[in-house]
Amino acid sequence: RLICDFVLGGNCSRGVDANSKRTSNYSPTGFLNKKFINPDLTKSKTGADYTNTPWPLIRLAELYLGYAECLVETNHLDEACTYLNKVRTRAGLPGVKEAWEQFGKEPAKATTKEGLRDIVRNERMNEFYLENQNFWDMRRWLLAEKYFNVKVKGLNIDAENINDFGEVQEVVFERKFQSPMNYLMPIPSADINR
């Protein structure tokens, strides 16, 4: 599912000298994302091109993976694998049990409730990358403080060659998630005063 091109410079760097140093409009992690970017559009000489693109409110994969998650929690593991496989097949991947038996470090992981729960969560993270689902999933699973309090890491955007670019660096910005406070959302006053 993941295809990468590595390019030095461009929007992945802060710039090379005092005249070109950037304080914004660059990727601090070195990763630029192309999901949902129309490949026919490129930046023109006179400005940026744009197009209106429909955005799905809910995708079939979300229904399948949500249902698979429910099936795992109610101990219907074989049926959960069926719905996981519908998403994996569309992406050109082998079935979940087959993949774990052949390529996984834990071949029996897809046969246990805890293992399949982890697999469903990982599938959701991969499938809904950049679709703002992970934030809500982590809160729903009560895992946000575990994952949202770690330091962000990225590539070495100041590198001058491709080997140094691949070195993992800590990115200088802090994330804080406080439990239980950040698991809760305020109720708007307009709703309270109805």
List PLM regions with ranges.
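Acidic/polar-rich alpha-helix caps and helix-coil junctions
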Residues: 2-194
